[in-house]
Amino acid sequence: MVKTITVSDDVYNELLRIKGKKSFSELLRELLREKKGNSVALKHIYGILNGEEYRETRKRLKELEKEFEKWKQFLTQV
């Protein structure tokens, strides 16, 4: 079954840029899997860290995400 969705031009252009040779369905499926994986990982560590450790871990993860995004942009420009 096929469904039609509407996205803004900037979102479409970003998806088009990162999809490469994949179909939009493949790209969206991959992005959803990544998002679900992050959620599962966070649920797994819930309760293991105290408040300060949790905040520090989240801060470091955000820093890493920014660096990975820069790396991804570099790789897609080459």
From Swiss-Prot:
Q: What is the lineage of its organism?
A: Archaea, Methanobacteriati, Methanobacteriota, Thermococci, Thermococcales
Family statement: Belongs to the UPF0330 family.
* Function summary: Possibly the antitoxin component of a type II toxin-antitoxin (TA) system. Its cognate toxin is VapC4 (Potential).
Matches recorded under InterPro entries: Put_antitoxin (IPR003847)
Transmembrane is among the record's keywords: no
What keywords is this UniProt entry annotated with?
A: Toxin-antitoxin system
Q: What is this protein called?
A: Putative antitoxin VapB4
